[in-house]
């Protein structure tokens, strides 16, 4: 089970410095946190000069603390007219502050700063605090300045989380409490993990100059030297990654190499439109190809869908992925709305009801055991659920305060609108196969062999057809029919917010109620059936006892059928596809392969198999693909990325000798 997050306690000393009662040490020098950040970390890493030579520049910090190093770096980036196009700041923190404590600490530090060489920082404090995520374990990606500055927070113990990151770092801010106060953060294991993430020209800087730290740096392949410390401190350490021997088996991720930043996305549902928006935001020109005459015509065309995280007592992979996807989606959706691309979604929460008293107790115990913050989920007794929903319920459940319902088609349209003139659409055309030419560019061909479009990169995001178009034999997915039912006004309890459990009920405009959905594997009938409506009515009756399934004529009801694409392990397929032909040629040498050993289909990516969780997973999946293409820090732990890697089935087949 993932360790729960224990927040930091905010304490000020008489001299105004912020101190940690847990570690018995200060967060910054009494001479000023921002001045310290500028002297030690920014100038110690040769910034801002060094980032001027990169399209994207990545910094890793080993302790976020009050956020002053990030704020000072962000301000320095803003003040530099020749700054890099995108700045990535990745910071690990075991004990993050709660939102308002962070705001108080950072605002206090900024108010007493004496630094004058960089742009004003006070306006940035509120931006950071307002975007501050729920204190849950894992990776949290925040974006500022229209996405040009990205803060990737990693909440957890550095010893555990650093080996699980996927990125290429240009600079390291080695910050944290003194080695004598927090020895684990300065242990050899930390520096070995950092060495696996270092660019060949990576630099580092740190306030400390202890002998133990110097030895650990040297053993990990970093060359160091002493320079004048901050505020009268005799020395601090700076240096660069300069290994004298091989210190890693795999190189950190690199950007996809191409002279033309153009891409094809096949499939204009939730998966594809999310990819379009994320690539266009990075300057890619995208051609979106959809076999229907308009976007979001398949399962994404449902009147509404629900979104919420999944909670499991053991915090398994699916639960962690859903939490990461849910929180990332909320962040991105708010950014779309702020940019003027509004879409229809409810904002009053969502209730998940238990199906038995025993299940309710397990649900309540899971929240307590995991330390789930109330802003994410809270237990709801039966009486409280009745009062909130204004109707009878059989059991209590969970309240997801930020969950709700959304129009998938409206979201897809907003994402395409955000792409602006970087998006070209081709509709009413079905792609039969893909072909990579001798020039390294991919061509999307129709059934006659005609080239519909060509580009450096292709993302297949067309659900159950994706594996066929990409020529994958080792990507087992299944089409699952789902029928939903629309109930006329006044025929169902008028719940004020979406309710899920054994099925779901969503209040729509004009008093209409949406309920569903059936789950019918390998059923290809696209016509709504009376039996499906009856099943949905019976499910609704179990969910809300005040409703009677027999009160309505199932044969007279309207509805819709969509088809989910579900992988055999119930997790999506997101990321760079494996090169199955190359793997077959090298099969004898790959029987013990890991995912990083498998040959890849250069420039070919997948985003499919989202099942019923497209709203939760599609935005995060799109960010992962865009990060992989552009060589940016991944927005989730490597362990989670590997759990949804499309090549995972190829690896399993290789291990069992089934690839030839």
Curated annotation (Swiss-Prot):
Residue ranges that the Swiss-Prot or TrEMBL entry lists as coiled coil: none
GO cellular component: cytoplasm
Localization: Cytoplasm
Keywords on record: Cytoplasm, FAD, Flavoprotein, Methyltransferase, Multifunctional enzyme, Oxidoreductase, S-adenosyl-L-methionine, Transferase, tRNA processing
Cofactor: FAD
Reactions catalysed, as given in the entry: 5-aminomethyl-2-thiouridine(34) in tRNA + S-adenosyl-L-methionine = 5-methylaminomethyl-2-thiouridine(34) in tRNA + S-adenosyl-L-homocysteine + H(+)
GO molecular function, one term: tRNA (5-methylaminomethyl-2-thiouridylate)(34)-methyltransferase activity
EC number, as in UniProt: 2.1.1.61, 1.5.-.-
Region of interest: tRNA (mnm(5)s(2)U34)-methyltransferase: 1-242
Region span, FAD-dependent cmnm(5)s(2)U34 oxidoreductase: 266-660
Pfam families cross-referenced by the UniProt entry: DAO (PF01266), Methyltransf_30 (PF05430)
Biological process according to GO: methylation; tRNA wobble base modification
Keyword Ribonucleoprotein: no
NCBIfam families referenced in this protein's UniProt entry, alphabetically: MnmC_Cterm, PRK01747.1-2, PRK01747.1-4, tRNA_MNMC2
The family this protein is said to belong to: In the N-terminal section; belongs to the methyltransferase superfamily. tRNA (mnm(5)s(2)U34)-methyltransferase family. In the C-terminal section; belongs to the DAO family.
Function of the molecule: Catalyzes the last two steps in the biosynthesis of 5-methylaminomethyl-2-thiouridine (mnm(5)s(2)U) at the wobble position (U34) in tRNA. Catalyzes the FAD-dependent demodification of cmnm(5)s(2)U34 to nm(5)s(2)U34, followed by the transfer of a methyl group from S-adenosyl-L-methionine to nm(5)s(2)U34, to form mnm(5)s(2)U34.
Protein name from the UniProt record: tRNA 5-methylaminomethyl-2-thiouridine biosynthesis bifunctional protein MnmC
Lineage: Bacteria, Pseudomonadati, Pseudomonadota, Betaproteobacteria, Burkholderiales
Gene name, Swiss-Prot/TrEMBL: mnmC
């Amino acid at each position: 089970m993932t360790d729960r997050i224990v927040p930091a306690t905010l304490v000020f000393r008489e001299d105004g410095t912020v101190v940690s009662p847990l570690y018995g040490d200060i967060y910054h020098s009494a001479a000023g946190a921002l001045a310290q950040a500028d002297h030690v970390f920014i100038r110690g890493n040769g910034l801002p000069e060094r980032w001027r030579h990169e399209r994207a520049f990545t910094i890793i910090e080993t302790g976020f603390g009050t956020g002053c190093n990030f704020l000072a770096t962000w301000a320095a980036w803003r003040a530099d007219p020749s700054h890099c196009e995108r700045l990535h700041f990745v910071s690990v923190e075991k004990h993050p502050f709660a939102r308002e404590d962070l705001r108080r600490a950072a605002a206090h530090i900024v108010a007493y700063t004496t630094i004058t060489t960089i742009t004003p920082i006070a306006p940035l404090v509120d931006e950071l605090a307002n975007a501050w995520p729920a204190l849950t374990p894992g990776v949290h990606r925040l974006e500022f300045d229209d996405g040009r500055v990205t803060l990737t927070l990693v909440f957890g113990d550095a010893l555990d989380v650093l080996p699980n990151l996927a990125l290429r770092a240009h600079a390291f801010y080695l910050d944290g409490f003194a080695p004598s106060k927090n020895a684990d953060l300065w242990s050899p294991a930390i520096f070995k993990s950092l060495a696996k993430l270092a660019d060949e020209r990576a630099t580092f800087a740190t306030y400390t100059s202890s002998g133990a730290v110097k030895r650990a740096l040297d053993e990990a392949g970093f060359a160091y030297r002493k320079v004048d410390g901050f505020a009268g401190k005799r020395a601090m350490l700076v240096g660069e990654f300069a290994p004298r021997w091989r210190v890693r088996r795999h190189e950190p991720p690199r950007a996809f190499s191409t002279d033309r930043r153009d891409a094809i996305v096949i499939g204009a549902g939730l998966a594809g439109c999310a990819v379009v928006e994320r690539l266009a935001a990075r300057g890619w020109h995208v051609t979106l190809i959809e076999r229907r005459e308009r976007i979001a015509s398949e399962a994404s065309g449902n009147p509404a869908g629900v979104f919420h995280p999944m909670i499991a007592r053991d915090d398994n992979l699916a639960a962690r992925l859903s939490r990461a996807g849910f929180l990332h989606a909320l962040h991105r959706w708010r950014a779309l709305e702020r940019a003027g691309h509004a879409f229809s979604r409810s904002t009053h929460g969502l209730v998940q009801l238990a199906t038995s008293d025993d299940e309710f107790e397990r649900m309540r115990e899971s929240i307590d055991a995991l330390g789930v913050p109330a802003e994410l989920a809270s237990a709801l007794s039966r009486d409280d659920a009745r009062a909130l929903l204004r109707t009878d319920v059989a059991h209590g459940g969970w309240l997801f305060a930020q969950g709700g319902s959304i129009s998938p088609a409206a979201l897809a349209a907003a994402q395409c609108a955000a792409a602006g003139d970087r998006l070209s659409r081709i509709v009413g055309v079905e792609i039969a196969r893909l072909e990579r030419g001798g020039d390294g560019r991919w061509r999307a061909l129709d059934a006659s062999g005609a080239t519909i479009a060509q580009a450096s990169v292709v993302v297949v995001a067309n659900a159950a057809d994706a594996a066929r178009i990409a020529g994958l034999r080792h990507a087992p997915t299944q089409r699952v029919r789902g029928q939903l039912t629309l109930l006329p006004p006044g025929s169902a309890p008028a719940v004020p917010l979406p309710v899920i459990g054994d099925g779901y009920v969503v209040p729509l405009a004009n008093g209409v109620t949406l309920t569903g959905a059936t789950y019918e594997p390998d059923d290809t009938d696209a016509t709504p059936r009376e039996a499906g409506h009856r099943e949905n009515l019976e499910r609704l009756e179990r969910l809300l006892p005040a409703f009677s399934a027999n009160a309505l004529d199932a044969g007279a009801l309207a509805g819709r059928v969509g088809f989910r694409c579900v992988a055999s392990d119930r997790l999506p397929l997101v990321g760079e596809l494996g090169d199955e032909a190359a793997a077959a040629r090298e099969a004898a040498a790959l029987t013990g392969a890991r995912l990083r050993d498998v040959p890849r289909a250069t420039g070919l990516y997948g985003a499919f198999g989202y099942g019923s969780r497209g709203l939760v997973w599609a935005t995060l999946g799109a960010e992962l693909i865009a990060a992989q293409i552009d060589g940016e820090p991944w927005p989730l732990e490597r362990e989670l990325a590997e759990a949804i890697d499309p090549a995972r089935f190829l690896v399993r087949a290789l291990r069992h000798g089934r690839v030839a």
